[in-house]
Swiss-Prot record:
BP terms from Gene Ontology: post-transcriptional regulation of gene expression
InterPro entries named among the record's database cross-references: ProQ, ProQ/FinO, ProQ/FinO_sf, ProQ_C
Gene3D superfamilies in alphabetical order: ProQ/FinO domain
GO CC annotations on file: cytosol
Name the record gives this protein: RNA chaperone ProQ
Chain segments carrying region Disordered: 106-188
Organism whose genome encodes this protein: Yersinia pestis
SMART domains found in the cross-reference section: ProQ (SM00945)
Record's function text: RNA chaperone with significant RNA binding, RNA strand exchange and RNA duplexing activities. May regulate ProP activity through an RNA-based, post-transcriptional mechanism.
GO molecular function, a single term: RNA strand-exchange activity
Amino acid sequence: MENQPKLNSSKEVIAFLAERFPLCFTAEGEARPLKIGIFQDLVERVQGEENLSKTQLRSALRLYTSSWRYLYGVKVGAERVDLDGNPCGVLEEQHVEHARKQLEEAKARVQAQRAEQQAKKREAAIAAGETPEPRRPRPAGKKPAPRREAGAAPENRKPRQSPRPQQVRPPRPQVEENQPRPVPVTDISKLQIGQEIKVRAGKSAMDATVLEIAKDGVRVQLSSGLAMIVRAEHLQF
C-alpha cells in the first residue's frame, strides 16, 4: 500500500482537520473554542493519518488557536467543544480575558507594522527627491448627501408642497423731494471750530465736529469719539 501524501504546512493540516472534524474545526469564519486537552485526543485519533506527526499537530493547533477568528469566538457564554462537536463546558472568565488581550496585542502589532511600512515608504520617497503628499483630513461635520435610489416607487416619495402665496409688501414711502441734499464743502476756511459737519464714507455720511482747520485738511471728531484729519472733498454740510 502506497503512503498517502504528507501535509507540508500548518494551514494544510488545519484544512485537513476541518474536513475530518467539521463539528470542531472550521477553515473559515468564526471558530468555536476547543476542549482543554484536545491535543491528546487528536494524537489518539489522527496520528498516522496523512503521515501526521505530533509536532505538526501541535504547530497547527497553535496557529489555529492564535488566529483572530478563533480569538473572536472566545467570548463570555461560549462553550468549548470536543472533536465531535459535543459541549465540554462554558468558558471561564480568565480564559475570555486572556483571549481579549491576545487579540488586542495582535491588532497592535499589525498597526505597528503598517506604520513602519509607511515610514519606510516616506523615507524612500524623500531619498529619491520626492515629497510625499500628506493626507488631507476630512472636514468634520460634513457628511455625504444620501443618494436617491434609482427606480424608487413614486409612492415612497413625499409629495411636493404647493408654493406658498407671496405676500404683497406695501410700497416703501418715497423720499420727499423737498428733503435737503448734502452740500459738499468747497472752502475749508469758512468752517469754524466746534461746527457740526458730516464726513462722507462711501455712500453714507457720519456726524462729526470740527476740532482744527489745518493746511492738509480738517481735523474732526466723530460721534464715536475718534479724531482724524479729513480732506475737504470728504466733508459736507
